[in-house]
Amino acid sequence: MTFIFQLALFALVALSFLLVVGVPVAFAAPEGWNVTKGYVFQGVSAWFALVFTVGVLNSLVA
């Protein structure tokens, strides 16, 4: 169970880093927002899901 928690936490940190870099790039590109809007929303949705998953796994591990 600890390994699954660590894997989910790593995925959360990696996705957070990708969103911190990717969202400003999507906003800065001239037509990038219209093209990448779906990817940004999918990334944010996955981020919220990972936050709740890590929270649940943390309560099970601790």
Curated annotation (Swiss-Prot):
Positions of transmembrane segments: 8-28, 41-61
InterPro entries per the UniProt record, alphabetical: PSII_PsbZ, PSII_PsbZ_sf
GO BP of this protein: photosynthesis; photosystem II stabilization
GO cellular component, one term: chloroplast thylakoid membrane
Topological relation to the membrane, as annotated: Multi-pass membrane protein
Domain of life, per lineage: Eukaryota
Keywords recorded for this protein, A-Z: Chloroplast, Membrane, Photosynthesis, Photosystem II, Plastid, Reaction center, Thylakoid, Transmembrane, Transmembrane helix
SUPFAM superfamilies per record: PsbZ-like (SSF161055)
Subcellular location: Plastid, Chloroplast thylakoid membrane
Subunit-structure text: PSII is composed of 1 copy each of membrane proteins PsbA, PsbB, PsbC, PsbD, PsbE, PsbF, PsbH, PsbI, PsbJ, PsbK, PsbL, PsbM, PsbT, PsbY, PsbZ, Psb30/Ycf12, at least 3 peripheral proteins of the oxygen-evolving complex and a large number of cofactors. It forms dimeric complexes.
Family annotation (HAMAP family): PSII_PsbZ
Family statement drawn from the similarity comment of this UniProt entry: Belongs to the PsbZ family.
Function description: May control the interaction of photosystem II (PSII) cores with the light-harvesting antenna, regulates electron flow through the 2 photosystem reaction centers. PSII is a light-driven water plastoquinone oxidoreductase, using light energy to abstract electrons from H(2)O, generating a proton gradient subsequently used for ATP formation.
Protein name: Photosystem II reaction center protein Z
Species this chain originates from: Nephroselmis olivacea (Green alga)
Lineage, highest ranks first: Eukaryota, Viridiplantae, Chlorophyta, Nephroselmidophyceae, Nephroselmidales
